Amino acid sequence: IQVSNLTFAYEGSHENIFENVSFQIDTNWRLGFVGRNGRGKTTFLNLLLGKYDYQGSISASVAFSYFPYSVEDKSILAIDAVEAMYPDYEYWKIQREMANLHLDDGVLYRPYDTLSNGEQTKLQLAVLFSKENNFLLIDEPTNHLDIRGRELVSRYLRTKKGFILVSHDRAFLDGCVDHILSINKSDIQVCKGNFSTWMENKQRQDAFEQAENEKRKREISRLEETAREKAGWSDTADRRKLRSGPLEVDNVK
């Protein structure tokens, strides 16, 4: 996936969310996507999905799918919801993925709205990961999972390849990603490693930048003090000249 000179701002806004962003990611990577709330994580996922116009280019050799999928009519059978998510699904692949998520395939023949939130999460992940040549954009999958469910889904994702994961659960991210996408102001950076590795690098970088900033402040203070001293010396010299009075010159006759 190649992103080149991506620039985007919402219509009517004079401030760019992204500005000249360029990076490349491998479609086999498991990427965690981090950044402060409101910095543009969901916006970027929507750009990958082609929902907004933008400047620059995004090229990919894979199709993108978004989690969570919005099932409009939740009264339908779960198997019909599967077909809505993936019309070309293969039943045995769905069963395989469901088994890996410890989800009994009997849920497929229940009304979708009778599934617990955790079962719905697992079913959707099973369907989306059964797709071929597909890259998942996974947005907060742990919202409706208990601790055991989170551990199970984390182990499941660790066996997969090709996704971007947004999650506020740091332990969850640590357990299943091998790269980090991070939003820094209007730019996006790619780092190898899990969330803890990225955080350690970020803290070192922040400490270095803070030290450099303090160093610059001290240098500015030193230069200002030197300038004040020189100005003081100049004022003292001028006052001495004034106290000594004008030089008398004898008339030469």
Regions found by a protein language model. Give the residues of each.
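Flexible nucleotide-interacting loop at or near the entrance of a catalytic core
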Residues: 1-10, 207-253
